[in-house]
Amino acid sequence: MLDVNNFEYMNIGLASPDKIRSWSFGEVKKPETINYRTLKPEKDGLFCERIFGPQKDWECHCGKYKRVRYKGVVCDRCGVEVTRAKVRRERMGHIELAAPVSHIWYFKGIPSRMGLVLDMSPRALEEVIYFASYVVTDPGNTPLEKKQLLSEKEFRAYLDKYGNTFSAAMGAEAINKLLQDIDLVKEVDTLKEELKTAQGQRRTRAIKRLEVLEAFRNSGNKPSWMILDVLPVIPPELRPMVQLDGGRFATSDLNDLYRRVINRNNRLKRLLDLGAPSIIVQNEKRMLQEAVDALIDNGRRGRPVTGPGNRPLKSLSHMLKGKQGRFRQNLLGKRVDYSGRSVIVVGPHLKMYQCGLPKEMALELFKPFVMKELVEKGLAHNIKSAKRKIERVQPEVWDVLESVIREHPVLLNRAPTLHRLGIQAFEPTLVEGRAIRLHPLVCTAYNADFDGDQMAVHVPLSAEAQAEARILMLAAQNILNPKDGKPVVTPSQDMVLGNYYLTLERKGAIGEGMVFKDTNEALLAYQNGYVHLHTRVAVAANSLKNVTFTDEQRSKLLITTVGKLIFNEILPESFPYMNEPTKSNIEEKTPDRFFLEKGEDVKATIEKQEINAPFKKGILGKIIAEIFKRFHITETSKMLDRMKNLGFKYSTKAGITVGVSDIVVLDDKQKILEEAQAKVDNVMKQFRRGLITEEERYERVISIWSSSKDVIQGKLMKSLDEVNPIYMMSDSGARGNASNFTQLAGMRGLMANPAGRIIELPIKSSFREGLTVLEYFISTHGARKGLADTALKTADSGYLTRRLVDVAQDVIIRETDCGTDRGILAKSIREGNEIIEKLEERLIGRFARKPIVHPETGEVIVGENELIDEDKALEVVEAGIEEVWIRSAFTCNTPHGVCKRCYGRNLATGTDVEVGEAVGIIAAQSIGEPGTQLTMRTFHTGGVAGDDITQGLPRIQELFEARNPKGQATISEIDGVVAEINDVRDKQQEIVVQGDVETRSYTAPYNARLKVVEGDKVTRGQVLTEGSIDPKELLKVTDMTAVQEYLLHEVQKVYRMQGVEIGDKHVEVMVRQMLRKVRVADAGDTDVLPGTLLDVHQFTEANKKVLFEGKRPATGRPVLLGITKASLETDSFLSAASFQETTRVLTDAAIKGKRDELLGLKENVIIGKLVPAGTGMPNYRKVKPVSQVQPSDDMVPVE
């Protein structure tokens, strides 16, 4: 058996008839499958044991030889070799065809490869192959042309006229003759000559032909191999036939298709032997051709062959295609052993790195480990009795299980796995019951809740797998989100509420102004009811052992609350004492105003001070981030557990409930509504008088109602009591927001109709008061649309992620530094006047391309190729620098990947990225995962020009697929000045741009808003009208840099508008993949073909070679491909075939004789090799374990 890990590459090509015969173990002559009485395979049939091997291990067909001792013997009676039955999965057979047939992939594909080689149209080919016309194969000395088509009538006429001086034929034989006659070298030379002069359609056709002919010439495939003389028969175990309960048989469709071929082939042989009339033979040949077509790709031509119940049969091509095909079903998505799944419930008592595993499940999953341990401990004599013990669940098994699972991590996965945090490792603890217990803090990463979600468990078996799970995948190690580098394990819901309640302050609470010597005394007073959690008290600062207090602060009293004393117990000692939710308190120290001299009037000071806000969800997140930055990850995870425990404890103590009485309806509501109604009546009056248009009226009415809803919302939030439970829930960030709240107690506001247009009649009632029937009816539209949108969005978002992963799957960090001298100029991203992404955010974790110098002092803040961290980024921004040259994936020179310097920091760990990190997949997941949070709809701006601006998910798809956008903007193709703007017919406007050399005029579409005025200076690629730019147009008039920047900014705009943060580098990696190809314009003296798409690296290599010899290099233009197109254009045919258009990709690859170098991840998963990323990188795989070496004297012990 060949070892998968020793593969270097994989080739694909056309099989010659001799090659097919050499694969085969015998010819299949009969269409029979198995004998219905003996249920044994028929001889020479489709399941013949002589050809394909025995059905039972070490046993021949007739039973003369049984047992392994006859291994390799060929039975003299039945001719079956005695061997393992599994050879029936690998041995092939063949069928000798009585007449050649064409292979439908090469004849029917688009473009028709056979047609291109022969320079015939697919129509003509079809007529010849399916016996409708004759084709002249050799005109002899007649005026006929070679490859000329003749109808039956014409053929007869010419035959009478010229006799046998010319030859014409029909069917695949004729095509075969023509293909054999082709002189590839001569054809290629003629085409190259023709290319020098050809234009238009002739040129494109010539380029296509040249590509195919060159492919045949370079790959060593012969064109005549596109015609089959021999048909391979795949191994019988891959097209099985099984007996069902009722004695009936179920069989693979392929057997039916093979049977049809064999039947027709045998009939044709008989007819030929009998010397039947040509018309009958021709018909039989055509039927054979159709049978082979159906076998290879049923339904590609004409009506598909159907089985019982009019179901089209699944041919060989269908076995590969689509989600259920071989690639996606069995090679990329295997089911694995040592796995289980169950419902999840919350495990609030667990530590960050633990999960609860049901006992029965654990026993089954760790069975082999338990068996080994039982034998080793002497509790069972052998493996068999150990197995029996486990199956009977004897008591001693549980103790062994406990010891086996200790320190053995398991992987938990929740579908859909949208990003890498969808699978994490935990240390199992055994629990009663049948549900898996999950730590509450990892729910955000999994997007899990406990309303019936299920999760899968997998056991890493080998020592390496366990080590990787423990070091890289343990939940306690994955605190940051790979998409933006912010903590993903932040407390939510109850935990937020508990910590919020704990850190509340109230004026005049019981025991205000008491002074305590330390925390314990304060807690004692709290437990005995002298003070409340929210009471402001004073504590001796030196008793708190906080390292960040200054000496002066230590000698004083600290004003705080009992709750905050408790909260600060969970923070490390060297972290500032948290007394107010401000940036300075988190990052620097506790503000001085909370300290007072001993002996001052505590009560009076407290009464003077303002109340501090409690700690909301965002602040908790910032505290976690800061702790992560300052301390080790272990410390952070311990602190998170403590924060979780506090949250649960105090949300329970708070006893927060919601009752109807908590929803207080606003007193002024009626008055506000009446004022709004008066304004609306006024607008209607103006409209009736014809002072405003219908559009304006609609816009104004909508804006009046929405502003009155905002007024109600503002007043409502102010009127609420601090300790109103609903207010606390929404203010802390635990659940609900101001808008939900307004709907409960204020008014529901405006609703949209099913078409998405806003209905101008608002819903004035709130849920507390109850809706009228009409109001209820109006609000159902929105609810229904919401549900429908969500369902559609999930599917769309998933498909987007799949395409993104596919295009970037081979982008891996391959080296430390690619040595490029290019970079990008980073400045803050703006939308109008609003900053969408600050410069500071764009700089953190990147390498500087040029030294960054302080504009005033001239000191170097960051050197060249030095990492910019948070402090340096802040320094740069504070120095007033607005743009910085940084290294970027856009300009990285590493082939098939990115280098460490151009990528920068790994957002998931906050440290340098490692060589071998699969950054392409991380990027794809980071962009795809928030896809479900984006909106589906295009915003309808009530019929205003510059119409529907696409946003949300559709806009992201539009950008990554490089489609022409909706509401396209006109851009200037030259640098110059706007000379004039004229009105032309139908409210269109003409913009004339005058450059130094030429003048261009552009017609802006009806009602478009212009972005320039007369006399403005414009540069090429600048927008003249409002709307989105077509990136392909932009690439034509500007360069790659402009397009890269445009796509990056646009993608960021969509996500940031929806409040989703994504690191720039992820978008950069994706956009880089879209701009990898160059379209060759002129080949120069290189071997490349004009008009072909080449990888940038292949293009530069080809040019380097020629330039060294002092010849003319090729020229080309960068091409922007959408992600689907880019995935299909990848160098790896395995990856492309498993993505989409499987047959087209394989046809193309076979003709070109492509070699897959197995550089990406998908290709390696398909052939079952370790992926070349992480510890699977070739340079790590070659590390050999050394025997136990004694430390030598010159070794230095590590501190």
Swiss-Prot record:
Positions annotated to bind Zn(2+) 1: 60, 62, 75, 78
Reactions that this protein is recorded to catalyse: RNA(n) + a ribonucleoside 5'-triphosphate = RNA(n+1) + diphosphate
Positions bound to Zn(2+) 2: 818, 892, 899, 902
Cofactor(s) recorded in Swiss-Prot or TrEMBL: Mg(2+); Zn(2+)
Top-level taxon of origin: Bacteria
GO molecular function, one term: DNA binding
InterPro entries cross-referenced by the UniProt entry: DNA-dir_RpoC_beta_prime, DNA-dir_RpoC_beta_prime_bact, RNA_pol_asu, RNA_pol_N, RNA_pol_Rpb1_1, RNA_pol_Rpb1_3, RNA_pol_Rpb1_3_sf, RNA_pol_Rpb1_4
NCBIfam families per record: rpoC_TIGR (TIGR02386)
Name listed for the protein in its UniProt record: DNA-directed RNA polymerase subunit beta'
Source organism of this protein record: Bacillus pumilus (strain SAFR-032)
Recorded name of the encoding gene: rpoC
